[in-house]
Amino acid sequence: MKTSLLADPLFFTTPQLARFRFAFKLTFAVVLSLFLGFHLQLGTPNTAVMTAAIVAGGPAFVAGGEPFSGAIRHRGMLRIVGTFIGCIGALAIIISTIRAPIVMMLLCCIWAGLCNWISSLVKIENSYIFGLAGYTTLIIILATQGTPMLTPQFAVERCSEIVLGIACVIFADLLFAPRSIKQDVDRSLRELMVGQYRLLQLSMSGADEGTIDTTWHALVRKTTALDGMRSNLMMESSRWQNSNRRLTSLHTQSLTMITQACETYLTLQDVPTHVKSSLKQVLDPPVESFGDVHHHVKALRHLIAADSRDVPPTLVSWVGAATRYLLLVKGVQTNGRISKIEADVLNHDVEIKVPSAETHHAMINGLRTGVATALGCLFWLSTGWSSGGICMMMIAVVTSLAMRLPNPKMVGMDFLYGTIYSLPLGALMFMFILPSTQQSILLLCLSLGAMTFFLGVEVQKRRLGSLGALISTINVLLLNNPMTFNISLFLDNAIGQIIGCFVALMVILLIRDNTKSHTGRTLLNRFVYGAVSALTTDTTRRKENHLPALYQQLFLLLNRFPDDMAKYRLALWMIIMHQRLRTLDIPQNAALSAFHRQIRATAEQVILARRDTTRSRYFTQLLEELERYQQILTEQQLPPNVTVPVGRLTGILRDYQHALSD
């Protein structure tokens, strides 16, 4: 098999040197972009150097260590796309408002807020595009404020410098032993299967609620992390296409096993049932490895094949999902062709995407960015401060990058501390070290490389202020061609950065995000819709796989309400009911199909209702329709395994009516 460069790292492969691999990678990328920027006679090599630092340092700070190869490349591609969108936005604003500078700045603030609003609605791995587009437009307009006719030239130069910086980062990543995620994926798949089997053992043995909650919570997080690894794997190379398809299905199989194990536990708690000795004999022995789980699942399959009458239906479903999981894991490990059996598994379900539940949260994020940049613009215009532009730029950068992260306040503090650290560090570099290196590009690269290396080590440790210090210090050094050493300009820029970050942090703290309860209620009502939407006689709709979307919403619920176990249990019950109702054998009937459509429409109205009274009225209507639906099923003399789950869903919704409708 032909090996790629990813499989043959060139440097820093030993464990002792691997700890400093990222710092050397970051340093090499920064120094190479600086050297090429001067060699190619770029106007502002500083942009290429900052791009290299941001693209390499950002993922490392988030990961708390060396980022995977795919993460760096993905970040680079997003930065290119976001820059192009920002340049187009800047050209459009300048062309339309060239005779009205104040209107131009106002449109800039609105554009930044709009981009941040969009970035809060899209998938989090792609949100960087729109956040970057917002402040790129602001940077271009501020840089060409006195000479708007040069905007196209400046936009082209900025795009060229950013592409150069990204190319240097990717080359450094390939050169310094890229960290492939494939081995981590294989290990996570094995560990996840062991965790799934242990959850099943706890469910069958009647463990206490605290242990069950802790275990399934950890498995949900590991399954979500596995889906993130799948995205990183695809960023590495296109040769992982087959593994990507398998991992998508493995995500569903893992969620199915979690759901079936939890349903088994809840069913046994409600109706205690004696577990056969033959079943206990297979389930009770502890498992320590992936091989042990494979052996136990095989024994369970033989037991079910011999006599499935005394085996809980949820356990049968769990074993089926585990069998599919084991089959697909083997394919991921080899990355071979997809067999016919695997293709049947992969094509069985059609995954459904759902819109974001954080629309109000996104609106607050956009408002924060728009207000913050408008305040910076007002401060600049009223004072006439020469570095008001860089203050505005830092406000836009901080508010755009911080809002989508789980803790915007900490991101704002990191930038504020970083800009404060950059003042003495930048002064040392700008006043004493860099002037002594003007006769030699080698000395210039060595001095900047030494600073980058030590800051890179701190970034890898997630030291507060380290990433902000790296970016802010490079920004105030003014690495232009030719270089000039204007002390007053340096101080203005350094202080402007600090004030901009302070204003951004104040806006984050003062404009509070009070949408938490609204988001939680929307998520819970979407769980209800997911459960009732499983009631259908349409075979095509039955193949719709809502499970990944439901667990994605559950994961968001976990992040927004980390200590509210009641919400978790309600959401988990709705997911369980979705899975149970999806398997009901409902006969083809025009009247039932019409009732299904009516129930779905009412559940959708519960989600869309803006007022509590309207929501409560629609929720009461939904309960009445479900009760009437159960009566129709009973009148048609359908078996209890069809009517009882519908009654169970109605009972759960009635118990939680206050939490769901008010």
UniProtKB/Swiss-Prot annotation:
GO terms for cellular component: plasma membrane. Keywords: Cell inner membrane, Cell membrane, Membrane, Transmembrane, Transmembrane helix, Transport. The chain crosses the membrane at residues 22-42, 52-72, 78-98, 102-122, 129-149, 161-181, 378-398, 415-435, 439-459, 467-487, 491-511. It is found in: Cell inner membrane. One of its GO terms (molecular function) is transmembrane transporter activity. It is a multi-pass membrane protein. One of its GO terms (biological process) is carboxylic acid transport. Forms an efflux pump with AaeA. Could function as a metabolic relief valve, allowing to eliminate certain compounds when they accumulate to high levels in the cell. PANTHER family: MULTIDRUG RESISTANCE PROTEIN MDTO (PTHR30509:SF9), P-HYDROXYBENZOIC ACID EFFLUX PUMP SUBUNIT-RELATED (PTHR30509). Belongs to the aromatic acid exporter ArAE (TC 2.A.85) family. This is p-hydroxybenzoic acid efflux pump subunit AaeB. It comes from Pectobacterium parmentieri (strain WPP163) (Pectobacterium wasabiae (strain WPP163)). The gene is aaeB.
